[in-house]
Amino acid sequence: MKIKTGKGTVTLAVLLAIWSVSAIASLPGLAISPILGDLNKIFPKATDLEIQMLTSLPSLLIIPFVLLAGKLSVGRDKLKILAVGLSIFFLSGVACLFARSMMWLIVISCILGIGAGMVIPFSTGLVVDYFTGDYRVRQLGYSSSINNLTLVLATVVTGYLANVDWHLPFLVYTL
């Protein structure tokens, strides 16, 4: 099946890949939310500062890597940069499943923030690259809808998973 882009067509597989990047862009930080209230029980020696760092440092690291990925993608192979970002995001999400200390969880979450920062610019950037005119506007709307729908569904899923085991919400990063 071919999808019109305004400058030609793309396959359905390419469109689904673009949409999947939009889905991932909403996930950073999501797994921490359902376990935030329990972190003092999970890690009794954790300080309030460490808990605050766990929620803020990954988001802070997203900012420079969004800028860096955007800058690097000009005149370079965007898909390679995206693949590196997705790999970092996925592998750090898996590593969170095995975290045994607050410091380890903070470090892994920071690495996850780096990967997310490399992925986020492509959630709309790929749409802009592949589509023009009304086709672009429509796809940007779909991208935004997918991003928000993923956020809602993943929030519900991570909440349920947190009731089973505090590690399980991190599975959301392996999508």
Can you say where each PLM-predicted feature lies in the sequence?
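Conserved MFS/SLC helix-loop-helix module at the cytosolic interface between two early adjacent transmembrane helices
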Residues: 64-103
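Cytoplasmic helix-loop-helix junction between adjacent transmembrane helices
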Residues: 102, 108-147
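Extracytoplasmic
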Residues: 13-48, 69
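Residue-level signature of mid-helix packing/kink "hotspots" within the transmembrane helices
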Residues: 30, 58-67, 151-152
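Small-residue-rich segments within alpha-helical transmembrane domains of MFS-like 12-TM solute carriers
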Residues: 26, 30, 97, 113-121, ...
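Helix-loop-helix hairpin linking two adjacent transmembrane segments in secondary transporters
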Residues: 142-175
